[in-house]
């Protein structure tokens, strides 16, 4: 392994450590979303606002939440 390869590997590893896990971010938004879905059903229009807030929060951390449709 060359010195350049070692540097690149260290940078990649550091990036992975700096990025939080999806389960550890947006907890309040996730709780609101999950509670709404639990009591109103996944297809309820009532939950759309909470789902969108959660998706926007996750995007802020670099995660992409796929649409259920």
UniProtKB/Swiss-Prot annotation:
Motif Cx9C motif 1 mapped to chain? 26-36
Give the keywords, sorted: Chaperone, Copper, Disulfide bond, Metal-binding, Mitochondrion
Q: What is its main location?
A: mitochondrion
Q: Does the keyword Lipid biosynthesis apply?
A: no
Provide the disulphide bond pattern: 26-57, 36-47
Source domain of life is Eukaryota
Q: Name one GO biological process term.
A: mitochondrial cytochrome c oxidase assembly
Name of the molecule in the record: Cytochrome c oxidase copper chaperone
């Amino acid at each position: 392994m060359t010195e350049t390869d070692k540097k690149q590997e260290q940078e990649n590893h550091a990036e992975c450590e700096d990025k939080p896990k999806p389960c550890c971010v947006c907890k309040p938004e996730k709780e609101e979303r999950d509670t709404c879905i639990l009591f109103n059903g996944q297809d309820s229009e009532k939950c759309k606002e909470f789902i969108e807030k959660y998706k926007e929060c996750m995007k802020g951390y670099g995660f992409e939440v796929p649409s259920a449709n």
